[in-house]
From Swiss-Prot:
Gene (name only): php
Cofactor descriptive note: Binds 1 Co(2+) ion per subunit. Binds 1 Fe cation per subunit.
Protein name as annotated: Aryldialkylphosphatase
UniProt keyword tRNA processing present: no
InterPro entries in UniProt: AryldialkylPase_Zn-BS (IPR017947), Metal_Hydrolase (IPR032466), Phosphotriesterase (IPR001559)
Classification lineage: Archaea, Thermoproteota, Thermoprotei, Sulfolobales, Sulfolobaceae
Chain residues that bind Co(2+): K137, H170, H199
Modified residues (N6-carboxylysine): K137
Regulation: Inactivated by EDTA and o-phenanthroline.
Length: 314
């Protein structure tokens, strides 16, 4: 299966190379930006994205998967500009990011109608361009699987069955939303191997993470540096334990880094306390060296960062 890239020709999955599976070039509140654009500086956002992508590329990153969809400020033209300036392989997605309710537009609209929007992005292109989505992104968090969240999950399943693109999720690792996402998607006929349950690295509950992997899905240990959810050292120990227990073929590691984000909790003055080491290169500076010191060889590193993304998109 070929993987569509932003601003470039598609590639075969075997050519994906070293991949960061969950990073954001930019995240913003769509309604706020539309109404008060003076709060934002796109030139600065662009510089931030270009600089961070180039830093990642210095460590050998070939492909970045950016799960910024509706609700997070997806802007395919901004993504194109960053690709042109850096040369990175960038995979964009479709989907809807909500925790509770869908926007009013979706009142009295069906699951099939939501799925049609996802399928449009996958088959026709995103936001009036020829850039096609390579995956579907869905979310569930502390409120659990609400009625509208479930509609989006089932719509993602329809899109997967129609187009064969995989599904990446945002989950809360402390309330079983990942297991519920997996259950609903597989109930709808999605191959569990085409599901990546995100943010499982926010817990060191090994048994919970293994339950998801044992059902056939990939496990996202993908928030390295977000110490407010779990410190880096505990994330490293969890990752090492999973590798030692034979789960390297299910693991994907990333940072969920946002080159720019406008959320109030991400104000610069909060970062030293909540996420002092959060960056797009932390895993190269800390995690991979830690794993190697503890006996993890290059073959396993390649499995996690190259082979698993290849399988996921195949």
């Amino acid at each position: 299966m070929r993987i569509p890239l932003v601003g470039k020709d598609s590639i075969e999955s075997k050519d994906i190379g070293f991949t960061l599976i969950h990073e954001h070039l930019r995240v913003f509140s769509e309604a706020v930006r539309q109404q008060w654009p003076h709060l934002y500086n796109e030139d600065e956002e662009f510089r931030n994205a270009v600089n961070e992508v180039k830093r990642a590329m210095q460590f050998g990153v070939k492909t970045i998967v950016d799960p910024t969809v509706m609700g997070l400020g997806r802007d395919i033209r901004f993504m194109e500009k960053v690709v042109k300036a850096t040369g990175i392989n960038l995979v964009a997605g479709t989907g809807i990011y909500i925790y509770i309710d869908l926007p009013f537009y979706f009142l009295n609209r069906s699951i099939d109608e939501i799925a049609d929007l996802f399928i449009h992005d996958i088959k026709e292109g995103i936001q009036g361009t020829l850039n096609k989505a390579g995956f579907v992104k869905i979310a569930a968090d502390e409120p659990g699987i609400t009625k509208d969240v479930e509609k989006v999950i089932r719509a993602a399943a329809i899109a997967n069955k129609e187009t064969k693109v995989p599904i990446i999720t945002h989950s809360n690792a402390h309330n079983n939303t990942g297991l519920e996402q997996q259950r609903i998607l597989t109930e709808e006929g999605v191959d569990p191997g085409k599901i990546l349950i995100g943010h499982l690295g926010d817990t060191d509950n090994i048994d919970y993470i293994k339950k998801i992997a044992d059902k056939g899905s990939f496990i996202g240990l993908d928030r390295y540096g977000l110490d407010l959810f779990l410190p880096v050292d505990k994330r490293n120990e969890t990752t090492l334990r999973l590798i030692k227990d034979g789960y390297s073929d299910k693991i994907m590691i990333s940072h969920d880094y946002c080159c720019t984000i406008d959320w109030g909790t991400a104000k610069p003055e909060y970062k030293p306390k909540l996420a002092p080491r959060w960056s797009i290169t932390l895993i190269f500076e800390d995690t991979i060296p830690f794993l190697k010191r503890n006996g993890v060889n290059e073959e396993v590193i390649a499995t996690i960062f190259k082979e698993n993304p290849k399988k996921f998109f195949s």
